[in-house]
């Protein structure tokens, strides 16, 4: 099995590529991780989990606190989201992350601090948005 995952993160209200990937709107940070086994993990604020399990395009839905690193999560929600992303990737044995061009620098910082490489895919999410699918027609 490969140890590469694809990651998109941010606010789906602003990040249209992220919204298109999960088709789920929230007001806080949402993280989608496509793991090497073909499953999609969505991490978001705990209050949104039940709704996301019903409506989001994801195989697994978790809250930020489900991936608390050994040093704990920051009290700042955006920082905690980035920390939980890195911890989820670490627990899944990921060594390399492919990210779209909108991945916030804070996520890159925590992912790299956890010992993983981050590579940019400039086209990730962009080409998908240029073609309408059946749900968008």
Residue ranges and their predicted role:
Residues 77-137:
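Flexible, acidic/His-enriched mid-domain "rim/lid" segments that flank
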Residues 1-91:
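Terminal domain-start leader segments
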């Amino acid at each position: 099995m490969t140890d590469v995952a694809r990651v998109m993160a941010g606010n789906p209200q602003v990040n249209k590529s992220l919204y298109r990937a999960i088709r789920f709107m929230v007001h806080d940070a949402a993280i989608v991780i496509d793991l090497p086994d073909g499953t999609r993990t969505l991490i978001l604020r705990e209050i949104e989990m039940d709704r996301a399990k019903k409506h989001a395009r994801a195989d697994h839905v978790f809250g930020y606190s489900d991936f608390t690193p050994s040093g704990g999560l920051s009290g700042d929600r955006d920082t905690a989201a980035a920390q939980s992303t890195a911890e989820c990737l670490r627990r899944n044995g990921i060594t390399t992350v492919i990210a779209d061009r909108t991945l916030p620098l804070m996520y890159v910082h925590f992912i790299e601090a956890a010992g993983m490489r981050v590579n940019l895919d400039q086209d990730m999410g962009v080409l998908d948005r240029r073609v309408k699918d059946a749900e968008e027609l």
